[in-house]
């Protein structure tokens, strides 16, 4: 046992050394030491400071931030985007309200833009080559803000150039199952153009699926049944309501992965190795173009052929048919085809992240990162500027306290404004690739506030299970907007809730996919993360997102008139995010409850037993080791929780606090296995990787099982099921091991 004693001494020495580590690459100038005579190793959350911050977060300042941020289009790397870089630097270097330091990090990344001299187009062409109808290349200028040289034409970023022409078919949401259904209906898809609607699968997946079946071009539109509760008339839509107008077109990246396409797993520095852009995976294989539902109606309501299935029908005021081609007595001559002309260009551009830093007084080498992306497709008042407006207000209030000398956090706070998010989470991913080791070793948590306000009904929170407790604690102390007198927590539970076997009725915490800048932090680095926003009442609308998402109608006036007239919901998000930020950066013991993972694991286990268990037994694959691993994790998490409670009742020395906090911080990393999903770029988290199966359980196991169930699957497929089961069991055992006393194995 002598080696155990040596290990214990080494761990203690390492922890002592850790208390003295500074931020290194993210350090503030040495002349402005953060340490004061009042600094104590036992520094804890100061409730008076917390109350002061809550009181100073100002809705009117958030409003003015948003007006400034969204007054011009600011697509990534544009002159206005770079002007906002300087705005952020100026705010964070302000002598009265700024932070300790601020700087930019630049990356040379591959972006995709439409050709201003040769706009993309969609036409109906007759059998003799005559163009009978050309669809509008831009959205209608309804408020004077939808036109001008800086308003990008609607396009599918990273779709390849080309001018395919063919008979039109309707392919619903463009899933693999949708294209198989068309073939089941006897439709030959070879050489056709597919009209699809947003939803169901990712943007890029629609084109990838289409190409597999011989389709040569894809159109994508937003159906009013999916976004407008079926409303589509001009007097029912923007600018007369919050609904998407008929000419509105959702832009977006059609790249399948995240990060710079040419430098996967490497930061996109000028000197970095780059892939050949012509042989890079993840791009749409065929020309693709989004259109408005006004244009989609002209196409879809003139299609011939069999009626589409009931669940493929939408709200364009006609019966949707499958095609191919148009009705002979419709608006277009018999035999007419659709021509899709895409002239997108790939360009290497320099994109900037902006980081503002407050160095911690006690544990400067422990980071709480708060991030939001800066770039938009057009004005981006909601996405992302509502989040940037909140970020700037939180940093102003904390910066003011910092400059007055009345407060400095226990741990370091890093504010991040990410670049080029809309093209595939590029800025945040490049940052994690550049500082992978440092961030994995030192980051406590990542807070993401992308869109801060979808609407003004209730909080929507997503995150990994350990953040549930800190979000609940914060929201119980903050009043919800309006006159209800409820806390944000009590208002939230009215709209979305679940019954926990441990806590009873609680608000529902959603899971994190890969839809915003938390993706690389969760899936690549294994960092505890969350995403916070205010949203709408889903009992009153079925909209899949706020209706003007990624269009030229997402403007300041849209926010002020329809989403949050008094900006009280923006203020509520600022208070929630600010409270969570302070609790994570200032609390002596990290307010992360690892036992909340036990509920998730038990739920996954139960789903696997019920849906997969019988068939697995037939293949001589036992879930017994998984049952044991889940039980061991639950026991270890509960034991650590009891240990923390005991320490909180005493006067623990700094080493004890540091060791426990490191266990809480590092738990998420234990779920990483970079070889678990070799086909999935950047996905290493065995609990939160993409689950394409219908069973809500461990994703690798669910996906492998679904594939093994396919016709003609052989022993190799079931071997992969066994491998994925072993990966999960090993991860859970490793996670449990991180929670036991640090000198034990």
From Swiss-Prot:
Its cofactor is Zn(2+). InterPro entries: PA_dom_sf, PA_domain, Peptidase_M28, Peptidase_M28B, TFR-like_dimer_dom, TFR-like_dimer_dom_sf. It comes from the Eukaryota. GO terms for molecular function: aminopeptidase activity; calcium ion binding; metallopeptidase activity; protein homodimerization activity; zinc ion binding. Zn(2+) 1 binds at residues 373, 383, 450. The chain crosses the membrane at residues 7-28. The active site is at 421 (proton donor/acceptor). Zn(2+) 2 binds at residues 383, 422, 550. Residues 29-745 are extracellular. GO terms for biological process: peptide catabolic process; proteolysis. It is a single-pass type II membrane protein. Homodimer. This is Aminopeptidase NAALADL1. It comes from Mus musculus.
């Amino acid at each position: 046992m002598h080696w155990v004693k040596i290990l214990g001494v080494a761990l203690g020495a390492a922890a002592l050394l850790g208390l003295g580590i500074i931020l290194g690459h993210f350090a503030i100038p040495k002349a402005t030491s953060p340490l004061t005579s009042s600094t104590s190793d036992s520094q804890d959350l100061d409730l008076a400071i917390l109350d002061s911050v809550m009181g100073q977060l100002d809705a009117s300042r958030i409003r003015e931030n948003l007006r400034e941020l969204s007054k011009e289009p600011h697509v990534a790397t544009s002159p206005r985007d770079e002007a906002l870089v300087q705005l952020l630097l100026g705010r964070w270097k302000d002598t009265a309200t700024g932070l300790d330091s601020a700087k930019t990090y630049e990356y040379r990344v591959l972006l995709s833009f439409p050709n201003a001299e040769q706009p993309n187009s969609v036409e109906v062409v007759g059998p003799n080559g005559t163009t009978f109808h050309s669809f509008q290349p831009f959205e209608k200028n309804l408020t004077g803000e939808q036109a001008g040289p800086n308003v990008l034409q609607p396009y599918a970023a990273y779709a390849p150039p080309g001018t395919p022409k063919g008979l039109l078919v309707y392919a619903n949401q463009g899933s693999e199952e949708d294209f198989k259904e068309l073939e089941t209906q006897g439709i030959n898809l070879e050489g056709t153009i597919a009209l699809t609607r947003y939803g169901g699968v990712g943007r890029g997946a629609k084109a990838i699926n289409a190409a597999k079946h011989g389709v040569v071009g894809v159109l994508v539109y937003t159906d009013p049944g999916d976004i407008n509760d079926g409303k589509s008339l001009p007097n029912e839509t923007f600018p007369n309501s919050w609904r998407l107008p008929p000419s509105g077109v959702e832009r977006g990246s059609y790249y399948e992965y995240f990060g710079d396409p040419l430098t996967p797993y490497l930061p996109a520095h000028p000197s970095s190795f780059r892939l050949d852009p012509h042989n890079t995976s993840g791009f749409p294989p065929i020309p693709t173009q989004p259109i408005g539902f006004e244009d989609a109606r002209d196409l879809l309501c003139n299609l011939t052929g069999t009626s589409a299935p009931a669940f493929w029908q939408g709200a364009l005021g006609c019966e949707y048919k499958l095609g191919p081609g148009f009705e002979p007595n419709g608006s277009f001559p018999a035999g007419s085809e659709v021509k899709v002309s895409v002239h997108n260009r790939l360009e290497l551009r320099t994109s900037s992240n902006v980081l503002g830093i407050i160095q911690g007084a006690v544990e400067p080498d422990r980071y709480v990162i708060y991030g939001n992306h800066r770039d938009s497709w057009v004005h981006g008042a909601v996405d992302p500027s509502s989040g940037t407006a909140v970020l700037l207000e939180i940093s102003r209030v904390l910066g003011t306290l910092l400059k007055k000398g009345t407060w400095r956090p226990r741990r370091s706070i890093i504010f991040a404004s990410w670049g080029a998010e809309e093209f595939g989470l590029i800025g945040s991913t490049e940052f994690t690739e550049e500082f992978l080791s440092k961030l994995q070793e030192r980051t406590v948590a990542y807070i993401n506030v992308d869109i801060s306000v979808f609407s003004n009904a209730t909080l929507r929170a997503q995150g990994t299970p350990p953040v549930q407790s800190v979000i609940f604690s914060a929201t119980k102390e903050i009043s919800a907007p309006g006159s209800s007198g409820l806390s944000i927590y009590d208002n939230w539970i009215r709209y979305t809730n679940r019954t926990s076997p441990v806590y009873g009725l609680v608000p529902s915490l959603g899971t994190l996919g890969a839809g915003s800048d938390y993706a690389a932090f969760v899936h690549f680095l294994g960092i505890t993360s969350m995403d916070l926003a205010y949203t709408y009442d889903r009992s009153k609308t079925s909209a899949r997102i706020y209706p003007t998402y990624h269009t030229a109608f997402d403007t300041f006036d849209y926010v002020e008139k329809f989403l949050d007239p008094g900006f009280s919901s923006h203020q509520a998000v600022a208070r929630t995010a600010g409270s969570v930020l302070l609790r994570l950066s200032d609390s002596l013991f990290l307010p992360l409850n690892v036992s909340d993972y036990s509920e998730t694991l038990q739920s996954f286990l139960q789903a696997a037993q019920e849906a997969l268990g019988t068939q697995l037994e037939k293949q001589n694959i036992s879930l017994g080791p998984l049952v044991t691993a889940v039980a061991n994790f639950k026991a270890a998490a509960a034991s650590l929780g009891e240990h923390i409670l005991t320490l909180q009742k005493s006067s623990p020395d700094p080493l004890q606090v540091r060791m426990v906090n490191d266990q809480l911080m590092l738990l998420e990393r234990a779920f990483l296995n970079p070889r678990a999903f070799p086909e999935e770029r950047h996905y290493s988290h065995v609990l939160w990787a993409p689950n394409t199966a219908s069973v809500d359980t461990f994703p690798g196991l669910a996906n492998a099982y679904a594939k093994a169930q396919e016709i003609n699957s052989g022993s190799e497929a079931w071997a992969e099921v066994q491998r994925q089961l072993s990966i999960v069991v090993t991860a859970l055992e490793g996670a449990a091991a991180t929670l036991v006393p640090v000198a034990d194995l």
